[in-house]
Swiss-Prot record:
The keyword Repressor applies. Residues 16-86 form the HTH gntR-type domain. Coiled coil: none annotated. Pfam families: GntR (PF00392), UTRA (PF07702). Its main location: cytoplasm. The gene is dasR. Gene3D superfamilies: Chorismate lyase-like, Winged helix-like DNA-binding domain superfamily/Winged helix DNA-binding domain. One of its GO terms (biological process) is negative regulation of DNA-templated transcription. InterPro entries: Bact_HTH_transcr_reg, Chorismate_lyase_/UTRA_dom_sf, Tscrpt_reg_HTH_GntR, UTRA, WH-like_DNA-bd_sf, WH_DNA-bd_sf. This is HTH-type transcriptional repressor DasR. It is found in: Cytoplasm. It comes from the Bacteria. One of its GO terms (cellular component) is cytoplasm. The lineage of its organism: Bacteria, Bacillati, Actinomycetota, Actinomycetes, Kitasatosporales. Residues 46-65 bind DNA.
Length: 253
């Protein structure tokens, strides 16, 4: 039986009118405002918004906070709330952070937060195809775009496969360039997982966001042309400033 036959003669389900909360009407007004005003435009004070929409002062922060979380507004401590810049859009492909930012017309820079050796647990050993307890070079960097913090990136590589890599990075500003020129290793394929997380106090401090703000957490496992593991990377991106875009194509099967 087709879908039309399955519902023939059925009574339509009545749709009950829903009362629109005042904070939601305010939120829609602010959304329309962000579409017409340039980034950096200040939002009217909470008292003004409460009076204009005939709502309590406690209702206004709810609408503002939701728009901050969604990346439409930006709250600057001690200054107020402003229309946010458009989110940085990144296609899901096997490219470096530097390439991604330059494609957006932004200037990529990095700050080294930590570099050192750690011992591989069972999970990390499996990802890098080394023995449990093996040495792993761990590189943690703060990624910026035109001076604005965007992500915290933590890279793990086998110390056995890439001996003296830590010294090589003194000469090379790009990790992938060092891997290619010193070890003749290039990334060929990767599996990437995207999840959500909430900003920890440390992450919020480094990225300049509020504690508990939604983040985009990426895990990337990259291999070379022979299928040998190269790196495992965990990155935390600002959910209010970043979005990922995937181009999908229907299979031929």
């Amino acid at each position: 039986m087709g879908a039309e036959g399955a519902v023939r003669g059925a009574r339509p389900v009545p749709v009950r009118a829903q009362r629109v909360p005042k904070y939601y009407r305010l939120k829609r007004h602010l959304l329309d405002m962000t579409d017409t005003l340039p980034p950096g435009t200040p939002v009217p004070p909470e008292r003004t918004l409460a009076a204009e929409f005939d709502t309590s002062r406690t209702t206004v922060p709810q609408a503002l906070q939701e728009l901050v979380v969604e990346g439409r507004l930006e709250r600057i401590q001690g200054k107020g709330t402003f229309v946010a810049k458009p989110k940085v859009s990144q296609a899901l492909q096997l490219t470096s952070y530097t390439e991604d930012m330059r494609a957006q017309g932004l200037e990529p820079t990095s700050q080294l937060l930590d570099i050192g050796y750690v011992t591989a647990d069972d999970t990390l050993a499996g990802l890098l195809d080394i023995s449990t307890g093996g040495r792993v070079l761990r590189i943690e960097r703060l990624r910026l775009a035109s001076g604005e913090p965007m992500a915290i990136e933590t890279t793990h590589l086998s110390a056995k496969r890439f001996p003296a890599l830590r010294r090589s990075l003194v000469k090379y500003t790009s990790l992938y360039t060092a891997l290619a020129e010193v070890y003749d290793v290039r990334l060929a394929e990767a599996e990437e997982t995207i999840e959500t997380s909430l900003a920890t106090p440390r992450e919020a401090g480094l990225l300049g966001t509020d504690v508990g703000l939604p983040m985009l957490m990426l895990s990337r496992h990259s291999v070379d042309g022979q299928g040998e593991p190269v790196e495992w990377v965990r990155s935390v991106y600002r959910g209010d400033r970043y979005k990922f875009v995937a181009r999908l194509k229907r299979g031929t099967d």
